[in-house]
Design a protein with these regions (language model features):
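Active-site-adjacent pocket-lining segments in enzyme domains
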Residues: 1-93
Length: 93
């Protein structure tokens, strides 16, 4: 995977990796992200092909849980969330 969180999208966009794709970032940077010919989605985590983007910095937790869910399953991701006392249903990420 290639990932970007918050304004980290700029590196991916400058490299041309986001052109024509769906992605997210912190809400104040939606217009800047859209200027790179990206379909901006107001979600915490967006996964398209091998690229995963997260919204604000705190979305990094949900992005990490999402990757655990994708690679190791819901049970592992939910256990990780519970272990760090992060109240979330990982099936909704």
């Amino acid at each position: 995977y290639v990932m970007g969180i918050c304004n980290g999208f700029q590196i991916l966009a400058e490299a041309g990796l986001l052109t024509g794709k769906k992605a997210t970032t912190y809400h104040t940077a939606f217009e800047e992200l859209a200027a790179y010919s990206v379909e901006v989605l107001p979600q915490k985590v967006v996964h398209e092909n091998n690229i995963i983007t997260g919204a604000g910095v705190s979305s990094g937790i949900e992005l990490g849980l999402y990757i655990l869910k994708e690679e190791f399953g819901v049970a592992v991701a939910q256990q990780a969330a519970d272990n760090i006392e992060y109240a979330i249903d990982v099936t909704k990420i």
